Swiss-Prot record:
Residues 134-145 have a biased composition (Polar residues). Residues 54-84, 102-148, 415-442 are annotated as: Disordered. It is found in: Nucleus. It comes from the Eukaryota. The keyword Transmembrane helix does not apply. This is Chromatin structure-remodeling complex subunit SFH1. PANTHER family: SNF5 (PTHR10019). Residues 415-424, 432-442 have a biased composition (Basic and acidic residues). One of its GO terms (cellular component) is nuclear chromosome. Pfam families: SNF5. Belongs to the SNF5 family. Its main location: nucleus. Residues 102-115 have a biased composition (Gly residues).
Length: 442
């Protein structure tokens, strides 16, 4: 799945907490045919009403190239005279957005008022012929205005748009028009789930206990890979509600009966990981300093760092650490949840090893006398080369190689975990049989 923009992540929070969130979303196949992309664009509700009532998909075509090789756009199409009203105004507006006359002829020159077929408004243009086309003899323009039109065609100047006068003026830009045509209305989450979502301000939330969640869902040729943090003490949303919202945004069917549906897989994965990490996440450990080897990759960038972490120190949480790292290294904002999630996973793994007695503490050598903690350590030989963060840009081959190695390591860890659990159950069963035989002898 393509990387979700940070704006979409923040909008997810806004749509949960607020009601007035107009949004267009679209989930479609990506170029590699293996993922889905989520396109979104905020819109005005009045603009949506005008778009639904007065437009048709046939009128929303791409801008047409004129005979002189220029693409008409920007302020070339001004507002439509609304005196005719009704469908005529809507048709004229759509024609203006496409650069066409009412009969389909291509307008040339500066738009102006005239006979039917000419785009109204602006500098008066020449009279049109009987076929509705404009000969363009009266329209004059200077190079600076033409340059401004080209710039506006490529990058729309949204601040100069008068939405009150022309609510459909933005549809002349191809990207915005494409969003309207290929997208659908995304309703508010409260309208989707009713009043089942509780307001966190009205719920007594204890200190947060964060659990890292990782999703790997396959459905109908699509593969969803996602990771996020889940607060065990925040009961304002259930895994079922989260799965409903996620499937709604990605245009997946919300079905609970099929076992292989994405809705069922998401709920099952979240519940399994919550049950697995619930005890470890809430476990309080003594003052314990451990060395963390942290890696987080996003797109083609790989972040690698080694540092010492105190498990009993709450003055710095992984989220704050990730914020500082991203600011210091100038990374993109999507690295904040990636680094925080990876650090939470590493800390839970250390807690699990410590609880099972398998933790090998790799303490940094302390050269202070009489057991005192030394101050700043100076590495004269390597100058601390292994203790500073590194960011590498990987090639496509290196990314695929890392993914394959990660899958192999995951399978190996699962096999080792299964062997350990099987050995423990066998030893437990053997002890029970020995106790039973001893009891029978007595």
């Amino acid at each position: 799945m393509s990387l979700v923009p940070q704006a979409y992540l923040s909008n997810f929070h806004n749509r949960v907490k607020n009601e007035d969130v107009p949004l267009f979303t679209a989930a479609q196949l990506s170029r590699n045919k293996r993922g889905k992309q989520v396109n979104y664009a905020e819109f005005d509700t009045d603009l949506l009403d005008e778009f639904i009532d007065k437009n048709d998909e046939d009128d929303l075509e791409d801008d047409v190239d004129d005979s002189d090789g220029r693409r008409r756009g920007g302020d070339y199409y001004d507002q439509v005279d609304g005196s005719d009203g009704g469908a005529a105004a809507a048709a004229a507006t759509a024609a203006a957005a496409a650069g066409l006359g009412e009969d389909g002829g291509i307008g040339e020159g500066t738009p102006g008022s005239g006979d039917p077929g000419a785009v109204t408004g602006g500098t008066p243009a020449a009279d049109t012929g009987p076929d509705g086309t404009n000969d363009g003899t009266a329209g004059t323009s200077n190079p600076s205005s033409e340059l401004d039109r080209i710039k506006l065609n490529d990058l729309p100047d949204l601040e100069s748009q008068d939405d009150s006068a022309t609510p459909l003026a933005l549809l002349k830009y191809p990207r915005i028009r494409e969003t309207f045509v290929q997208s659908r209305i995304a309703i508010s989450y409260k309208d989707l789930l009713g009043d089942s979502i509780q307001d966190p301000q009205q719920v007594d939330i204890e200190s947060p206990i964060m659990v890292p969640i990782r999703l790997n869902v396959e459905f109908s040729g699509h593969k969803l890979a996602d990771f996020f943090m889940w607060n065990l003490n925040d009961h304002s949303m259930t895994p079922e509600q989260f799965a409903t919202i996620l499937c709604q945004d990605l245009d997946f069917p919300v079905l609970s009966n099929p076992n292989n549906s994405p809705y069922t897989q998401i709920i099952s994965m979240i519940n399994e990981q919550l049950q697995e990490y619930e005890t470890l996440a809430s476990l309080q450990v003594p003052d314990l300093h451990v060395i963390i080897n942290l890696t987080a990759n996003l797109d083609s960038k790989l972040y690698d760092d080694t540092f010492e972490w105190n498990l009993n120190d709450d003055s710095l949480c992984p989220e704050q650490f990730a914020e500082l790292v991203v600011q210091d290294l100038g990374l993109q904002r999507e690295f904040v949840p990636a680094i925080a999630h990876s650090l939470h996973e590493s800390l839970l793994k250390v807690k699990k090893d410590w609880l099972e007695g398998n933790l090998n503490l790799a303490h940094v050598e302390n050269k202070a006398a009489f057991g005192y903690t030394s101050g700043i350590r100076l590495d004269i030989d390597t100058l601390g080369a292994s203790w500073f963060p590194k960011v590498e840009v990987l090639s496509q081959w290196e990314i695929e190689k890392r993914e394959i190695e990660k899958e192999r390591n995951m399978r190996r860890l699962k096999r080792e975990s299964a062997k350990v659990d099987d050995g423990r159950s066998r030893r437990r069963g053997k002890r029970r049989m020995d106790d039973l035989e001893t009891t029978l002898r007595i």
